[in-house]
Amino acid sequence: MPILQNVLLQASKDSVFLTTTNLDLGINCCVKAEVEKEGTVTLPVRELSKIVRELADIEVDVETSDGTKVSISTRGSTFNLVGMDSKEYPPLPGLEESDSFTINRECLLEMLKSVSYAQSVNEERYMLKGVFFKKESTDLSLVATDGRRLAVATKELTISENDGNCEFILPSITVNELEKLPQIGNTILLSYTDRQVQIELNVSEQTYENQGFRGSIKLISKVVEGKYPNFKQVIPKDNFKSAMVERELMLECVSRASLIADERITLRIKNKEMEITGQSILGDACENMPIDYEGEEATVSFNPKFIQDPLRCVKKDNITLEFRDDMSPGVFKINPKEKEQANLLCVVMPIRTD
């Protein structure tokens, strides 16, 4: 449907409502405006976004004619766009008899950031192309995996509209749009059915005055059909070696060692020190860093990207690395003391050495 390349603008009273959809995901928001004449129009969203992005942060005049032609003007600039008849624009679906729960906006976005990198990009494994939400009473877990690594973020909800359990898979495209939400409002309301999820970011009065948003920003998305695999079976329960490492330093060392590495780097863990090496037919690199570890020496190899991704996505200075041997998965863990932060873990499959 060509009209799905457009955004629907509806001017009414002192507001303009903006809606866009691809039939699987819909987004709706409202901004304040001085409306001289009510009406609706659809415009190509890509071109409109480019124009708005380049305009100065000042008032913009928008005029329509014939229901499809629009003139956008501001100080010294005028743009004319041709849209399509708004009557052809499909309405966003509503959720009926849905359950819901509330979560802090910043916490949810941090949890998503902590796991979304592990989503699968394999079209054949469609159930893994998204983030799995699992709510048990007041505990919420977000999970992503591509079969070679697993990321889990868990948080105890402090505000809950419903104490029931639920689980659904949010598609990767919805996750990407959710991560782009503006940093406004304090809470997000998630309403869900067996087939759809509505994510509503409430806008405060202060935000209305400062940025022009009003009401709420809503995302309505279909969920991925199918049952998510039992991720708890993947988490090792018998790792008996544990080292405390400085996150930023380890990220720097892994990044430098990977410059020479092929598809793997090797961690040699010994008393108070970790040696990180990478090699290829072109040469080799070696990094040494202090760690908090006392025990038998161990060596394990990983894909460097699978280490870099979780290290980049957390704020905590120190993390725990759990391991057993060169044939077993490694586990990166963060258990923050602050209640506002989520517990995080990332399971990474090793690369076998010859």
Outline where the language-model segments fall.
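Structural preference for solvent-exposed beta-strand-turn elements
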Residues: 1-354
